[in-house]
Amino acid sequence: MAAKEVKFGNEARIKMLEGVNILADAVKVTLGPKGRNVVLDKSFGAPTITKDGVSVAREIELEDKFQNMGAQMVKEVASKANDAAGDGTTTATVLAQAIVNEGLKAVAAGMNPMDLKRGIDKAVIAAVAELQVLSQPCADNNAIAQVGTISANSDEKVGRLIAEAMDKVGRDGVITVEDGQGLDDELAVVEGMQFDRGYLSPYFVNKPETGAVELDDPFILLVDKKVSNIREMLPVLEGVAKAGKPLLIVAEDVEGEALATLVVNTMRGIVKVAAVKAPGFGDRRKAMLQDIAMLTGGTVISEEVGMELEKATLEDLGRAKRIVITKENTTIIDGVGDAALIESRVAQIRQQIEETSSDYDREKLQERVAKLAGGVAVIKVGAATEVEMKEKKARVDDALHATRAAVEEGVVAGGGVALVRVAAKLAGLRGDNEDQNVGIKVALRAMEAPLRQIVINAGEEASVIANAVKNGEGNFGYNAYTEQYGDMLAMGILDPTKVTRSALQFASSIAGLMITTECMITELPKKDTPAMPDMGGMGGMGMM
């Protein structure tokens, strides 16, 4: 076991605080409408420019092990806020820094750290309850657009695009962010179910001008295995040919003789066929095939349930109004599935979303719900250069998370005003002893930090504006973008309640633990032992 270095008391806390301040100072320059950018060097490719707090935090690794421990703990605050609400990472970091700095001053003055932490916790619990009281529902598209605009660094176009996307695919719909082709941002809405599998052979293409396969009123054959023998499919193909309808085959794979025969039949015009691979892998593929079956009113031909492809009939096939297949995607429009069955399938998947602990699984399940329930909106981000594209995409992503959080728990006045009002309402809160009272004051004082930092980043005097806001009432605050005082809600400066709540809870949780630290242990750096010297020629060993 490697030797360790141990630091105690004030010496340990000072080192930890230095690390906290280095990371927080780098992150907090990005806060507010006039926050600055941070440039991150990458080991390959161009540097990344970002205004996203968690992206800055993740890049920081300090050489001094004790400082690094402090920095890593604050990094955890930003990461947790990002995971919970998808935004508010910079606010959480600023709050954590303020609580740690004020708290450690109180510890140095002789307060009991455990009582300080209890006081901080008490203040935060009361503050969260007060935030819920101040919260207003995010009712209309205008409010959604305003939340998106604020989170995207006052970019109104992004706010409007997100509101439009939510309007089209519903509050639960999937909205994805992709690289655009031009300079302008665009919104594309995919109606029906789309999955990322294209045609298996370019010979299926019947619209050469668009390079796509379009099938009107087709049958859909769903097979949960590889198909390589055409004889298995002959009964189905004959039935489809008699009906005079096109056919889409969705299978694990279609290869060899089977694919060749389908291509020949299509080219000769005997039967209009297209084949695609089933989306997903393993169990997820089975589930997605079932989703398509529900949507189209078909049955998955699976040997697991004793069904054979040779015995499949037209009754087992799904139907849809139209299918469009490109090189990369397949879109099924207007499946004829039973609406009640689709609804119960959606409810079943939503239940799985509640139960899963994996973020990846949750995301995939939500995509399945959207595909069954309402379609998918794609925001295509336009920019002049790749560096700008990355920065803008990160902002749009943040704005998207913020609007979802706003729809979920409502909104409060933005610009740090909500926390200032909460702190004012809790001025009379008391703990069980004097040290807890100091802890409460530490937390309440820290709640002013986001407002102060927004003002500092706007180049104004923080104390003057903070006092003016504190003397106001309700939603009265300072708009750093226009440099005017007024009603924050009327000016469209809103923060999602969930974002503000999460930032405060995670910041106080980690900061409280740091205040109660008395000892820090880290590995000593390994000393490089000098290499053994060359032995050289040994005397008396000359060649005979």
Swiss-Prot record:
CDD domains per the UniProt record, alphabetical: GroEL
GO molecular function terms noted in the UniProt entry: ATP binding; ATP-dependent protein folding chaperone; isomerase activity; unfolded protein binding
SUPFAM superfamilies tied to this protein: GroEL apical domain-like (SSF52029), GroEL equatorial domain-like (SSF48592), GroEL-intermediate domain like (SSF54849)
UniProtKB keywords: ATP-binding, Chaperone, Cytoplasm, Isomerase, Nucleotide-binding
Signal sequence extent: none
This protein's record includes keyword DNA repair: no
Enzyme Commission designation: 5.6.1.7
GO biological process: protein refolding
A GO CC term attached to the entry: cytoplasm
Compartments, as annotated in UniProt: Cytoplasm
Keyword Signal: no
Binding, ATP: 30-33, 51, 87-91, 415, 495
Taxonomy, superkingdom: Bacteria
HAMAP family, sorted: CH60
Family per similarity comment: Belongs to the chaperonin (HSP60) family.
General function of this protein: Together with its co-chaperonin GroES, plays an essential role in assisting protein folding. The GroEL-GroES system forms a nano-cage that allows encapsulation of the non-native substrate proteins and provides a physical environment optimized to promote and accelerate protein folding.
Alphabetical list of PANTHER family matching this protein: 60 KDA HEAT SHOCK PROTEIN, MITOCHONDRIAL
Complex formation: Forms a cylinder of 14 subunits composed of two heptameric rings stacked back-to-back. Interacts with the co-chaperonin GroES.
Designated name of the protein: Chaperonin GroEL
